[in-house]
Structure formats: structure tokens, C-alpha cells
Amino acid sequence: MSMQDPIADMLTRIRNGQAAHKVSVSMPSSKLKVAIANLLKEEGYIADIKVSGDVKPELEIELKYFQGKPVVELIQRVSRPGLRIYKKRGDLPKIMNGLGIAVVSTSKGVMTDRAARKAGMGGEIICYVA
């Protein structure tokens, strides 16, 4: 059976891994998943990422905790295959009054809502992270 929404699966694996206090989670890799994981690493929500394997690449995400609690409080899919959500630069949401991020897919690549606003771009809202 094929996977309908690989990005939602990735976010769910991160959410479940942190709820179970796992050190890391692994999943099948794709360019978009790696771009989202790199963005989460830059923003400090995950500790590290590794891509291994040539034929079927695996993405391994090392989860991050602070004083025993998961760093990621909220990770929620917004745009999905059945209902794509696009926003213009002025309509990009602020998550938790700027404490969280919205991951946006633009024509210049995957970036945060702050970076998209600064670049004057809108795009598809992939997920919210706080």
C-alpha cells in the first residue's frame, strides 16, 4: 500500500518519537523531507539529521529535549494532498505570536514564515511548529 501523505507521516513520527522519549526516529527520505528537517534543525527544534543508503535512502532525525521535556510542543500539518493551503506574503500566519514557525514552501525553496515575509514571498503552508 502506498503512503498518501509522506510529510504528515514524517511529522507524526517526530511527534510520537518525542512522546515516547526516543533518541531518534527514522523514515524513508525525500528532498522535501530533508529540506523540512534541515529547517527544523536550523530553528533548533531537532538535534541532528542523517541521510543514509543509496537505493532506498533513510532519513534519521535525532530528537531534542530540554530538561527532560520535548523541545517541540506543537507540530501540525496544514496543507495536505486533499486541501492545499496557499497564502500571500501579507497573509502568512504568526504562530504563537512569533514564538513558533510556519514552514512555507515557496518558489525559492522551503523556508520559515519570517524568511518568506522578509523575502516578500508567499507559498504553500506545509506545517506549524512550536
From Swiss-Prot:
One of its GO terms (biological process) is translation. It comes from the Bacteria. InterPro entries: Ribosomal_uS8, Ribosomal_uS8_CS, Ribosomal_uS8_sf. The keyword Ribonucleoprotein applies. GO terms for cellular component: ribonucleoprotein complex; ribosome. Gene3D superfamilies: 3.30.1370.30, 3.30.1490.10. PROSITE patterns: RIBOSOMAL_S8. Keywords: Ribonucleoprotein, Ribosomal protein, RNA-binding, rRNA-binding. One of its GO terms (molecular function) is rRNA binding. NCBIfam families: PRK00136.1 (NF001109). Belongs to the universal ribosomal protein uS8 family. One of the primary rRNA binding proteins, it binds directly to 16S rRNA central domain where it helps coordinate assembly of the platform of the 30S subunit. PANTHER family: 40S RIBOSOMAL PROTEIN S15A (PTHR11758). Part of the 30S ribosomal subunit. Contacts proteins S5 and S12. This is Small ribosomal subunit protein uS8. The gene is rpsH.
